[in-house]
Structure formats: C-alpha cells, structure tokens
Amino acid sequence: LLLDTLKASAPARVVVVPSKIHYRAKGINFDVLQQQTTSVGQLKEYGVAKLANVLFAKELARRVAGTGITTYALHPGVVATDVWRAVPRPFDALIKKFMMSEEQGAATTLHCATSAEAGAQSGLYYDKCKPQTPSAVSQDEALAAKLWAASEAWVVG
C-alpha cells in the first residue's frame, strides 16, 4: 500500500522489528494462520509471527532492489518495558536487572534507520547494531514468497 510513496521518497528505509524468538519457529502453517485461536501456545505463535516479520523484510528487500528502498529486520534486545507488567513480584524486579533500558533497546532500530553503514545494505537481520545470521527457515526464499502471496490475497479479500 505504501510502496509507491516509498519509491517516490527514495532513499527510504523500512525497519521491521521481529526478535530472536523467530529462531524457535520451525515454519509457518498457512492452514491455521487465519483461524481464531485461544491456544496456550502463545509463545510458539509469537515466534511464528516474528518469523513472518523476518521473511517479510527479506522478501520486501528482494522486491524493491534497485529502487532506493532498503529493508532491515532486527532484534531490539530484551528491554525493560511495560510488556513485562504481568510478571509477578518479586520476579519482575529480578528479571528487570538483566534487561536493557528503553534507550539501549532503541539503539539497533536507530542504527538501521539512520546509519550510513546500514544504508548501504538491504534485507539483513541485525542484533546489537551488527548484521547477524537469522534462522535457517527465515532464509527460505520460497517460504517468503508464499507468505507474501498469501498476505496479498488476505488483504485483497
């Protein structure tokens, strides 16, 4: 929906924020993607959603190559935000000692959005402001293309 605007605004960057949890996803079951779920496997589903984010960034990079649009997927880190508000006391204080601040968590996103170094590359996965190797399944070009086609079909209706 925004591709024409991004192309007209080039150079432009698209920063997608999945997380390391995508490494846990083994693939995408397209038969259940549009079904409503109340499953207890929320972490598994979250991993699949984050895998889809990485695949999207990679497929978008392929589709816009040479247009002045660059794409990035990244792991922001485990950040001490309100997302952890449901963790019971005293565990909340304990785990927050091992988390990074919101400012630290923004570093990789800002790096991908603004740095000259990142601007020269597209379709990469970043962690701690450096390109990293994403999961093997997230590098499956056929799966990325299938997800793109399915997503377009769902949006069109």
PLM segments and residue spans:
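Generic structural signal for alpha-helix termini and adjacent loop/cap motifs
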Residues: 1, 115-118, 157
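Catalytic loop of short-chain dehydrogenase/reductase
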Residues: 3, 7-69, 75-96
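Hydrophobic core positions within the conserved protein kinase catalytic domain
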Residues: 2-3, 109
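C-terminal helical subdomain
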Residues: 17, 49, 73, 96-134, ...
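Short C-terminal domain-edge/linker segments immediately following a structured domain
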Residues: 43-51, 62, 102-106, 141-142, ...
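Non-catalytic terminal and boundary segments that flank Rossmann-like NAD(P)-dependent oxidoreductase
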Residues: 11, 23, 27, 137, ...
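Residues that form generic nucleotide/phosphate-binding pockets
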Residues: 33, 97, 150, 154
